[in-house]
């Protein structure tokens, strides 16, 4: 197999202690997939980074804010946040996001 495989059962869930948890899935230098779980009311504080990010809602409901504009996202919805834009999310209903980053997030590997 020339591809990079990550079995969900082998990916460690890191509990942040704030109602969120991250599970780094398959990745290489150019791309990273991360499963992020949220309890209702938990949030990803507004921040910025040099990575382009795509968030896909697997379950739950989220209010996502990019550069001061908010949108509600439900299962099956997705959003792309270009590099350098301020963004954050609030979980309205317990759920899980699949976040894809390019390039990979070195800070998620520590």
PLM region spans:
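A short, N-terminal "cap"/entry segment at the start of jelly-roll beta-barrel domains
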Residues: 1-30, 110
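Conserved short histidine dyad/triad with adjacent acidic residue
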Residues: 34-48
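Histidine-centered metal-chelating micro-motifs
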Residues: 43-44, 63, 79, 83-88
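Amphipathic, hydrophobic secondary-structure cores in small proteins
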Residues: 49-51, 78
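Glycine- and acidic-residue-biased ligand/ion/polar-headgroup-sensing regions
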Residues: 51-62, 67
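A cytosolic small-molecule/anion-sensing beta-strand core signal
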Residues: 58-59, 74-75, 93
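Short acidic-glycine-tyrosine-enriched beta hairpin
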Residues: 68-83
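Ligand-binding loop in jelly-roll beta-barrel domains
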Residues: 83-107
């Amino acid at each position: 197999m020339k591809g990079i495989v990550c079995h969900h059962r082998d990916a460690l869930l890191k509990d942040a202690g704030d109602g969120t948890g991250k599970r780094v899935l398959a990745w290489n230098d150019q791309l990273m997939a991360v499963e992020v779980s949220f309890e209702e009311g938990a949030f990803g504080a507004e921040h910025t980074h040099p990575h382009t990010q795509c968030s896909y809602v697997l379950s739950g409901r989220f209010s996502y804010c990019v550069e001061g504009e908010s949108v509600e996202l439900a299962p099956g919805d997705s959003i792309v946040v270009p590099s350098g834009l301020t963004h954050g999310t609030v979980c309205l209903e317990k759920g899980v996001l699949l976040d894809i980053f390019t390039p990979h997030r070195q800070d998620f590997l520590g």
